Amino acid sequence: MPNWTFLSNHGQVLLCIAHDPGVRLREIGEQVGITERAAHRIVGELVDAGYLERERMGRRNHSAFTTRRGLPDPLARESSIGDLLNVLVARP
């Protein structure tokens, strides 16, 4: 296996949250292979950029995507975050 991945850490964090909107930062870090602090930073960047919204529900946070927001990649500007998630996340 190569030591690289097709998805950046930001993309992998998005996938973790798409699979479980209530996932904890510690769990994101474990799944992506980054520290909890790095997961916290990435989630904050996604919120600041308008791709993700966080809502406090009791003692936990719940995340929701802004699915119409365009991708930041110059080669994929015509696509939205929703388009990306539709391709990468299997829906039952």
Located regions from the model:
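Short alpha-helical segments that sit at the start of domains
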Residues: M1-Q12
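Short, locally clustered residues in the helix-turn-helix/winged-helix DNA-binding domain
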Residues: L15-H19
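Alpha-helical residues within the helix-turn-helix
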Residues: E30, V47-D48
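Key DNA-contact positions within bacterial/archaeal DNA-binding proteins
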Residues: R37
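Short, hydrophobic-biased segments on the C-terminal half of alpha helices
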Residues: V43-G44
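Short, Lys/Arg-rich nucleic-acid/phosphate-binding segment
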Residues: R56-H62
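Amphipathic alpha-helical dimerization/coiled-coil segments
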Residues: G70-P92
